[in-house]
Amino acid sequence: MDIRARTKIIDIYSNLKYKKPLKSFQKILTTSDSDNCEDFFNIGLNIDKNKITAIGFDGDGCIISTIATELSIKAIENKTINQAKKILSDLIATYKDKNSANQVVEELKLLIEMNVTEKRLQCLLLTPSNLLQWFKNF
């Protein structure tokens, strides 16, 4: 990862815009992972007419999972559920197969640049995977 990407990651982590109290949200999703990951986030959502009108998170995680949560939330805010599913599916598919033809939205390209190891992949995909599963069951 180049210095530009590292600087951007530190800047985002130091200025999380979507980390906030979740009292005003209609729905709360708690992330979970079957491995020994201790990272967890609560994702607050307001959905109106199948569109994500407001979204935020609280909780704690490593820098990778926190950045992935912040950027995933930014990417799906003001999108329909179907648009959010596509955005998250494309991210997951691209990360698992770098030769994938899927297009990753601009907000999530930094996650691809992070080039994490297999062990840290669960950190990066914690929130996107949980959100995608929740939207599939919506």
Swiss-Prot record:
An example of a GO molecular function for this protein is: iron ion binding
Organism's domain of life? Bacteria
Which InterPro entries does the entry link to? NIF_FeS_clus_asmbl_NifU_N (IPR002871)
Gene3D superfamilies documented for this protein: 3.90.1010.10
GO BP term, pick one: iron-sulfur cluster assembly
Regions that span the bilayer? none
Listed name of the protein: Uncharacterized protein MG337
Question: Which organism was this protein described from?
Answer: Mycoplasma genitalium (strain ATCC 33530 / DSM 19775 / NCTC 10195 / G37) (Mycoplasmoides genitalium)
Record lineage: Bacteria, Bacillati, Mycoplasmatota, Mycoplasmoidales, Mycoplasmoidaceae
